[in-house]
Amino acid sequence: SEGGQDFWL
């Protein structure tokens, strides 16, 4: 979300 890398979590 904030980092833009919460799509693989």
Curated annotation (Swiss-Prot):
Task: List all membrane-crossing ranges.
Answer: none
Q: Where mainly located?
A: secreted
Q: Identify the domain of life.
A: Eukaryota
Keywords, sorted A to Z: Hormone, Secreted
- GO function terms (MF aspect): hormone activity
Cellular component terms, GO, for this chain's entry? extracellular region
Name where it's found.
Secreted
Which family is it part of? Belongs to the gastrin/cholecystokinin family.
Q: What does this protein do?
A: May control digestion processes in crustaceans.
* Name the record gives this protein: Gastrin/cholecystokinin-like peptide D1
Annotated organism of origin: Nephrops norvegicus
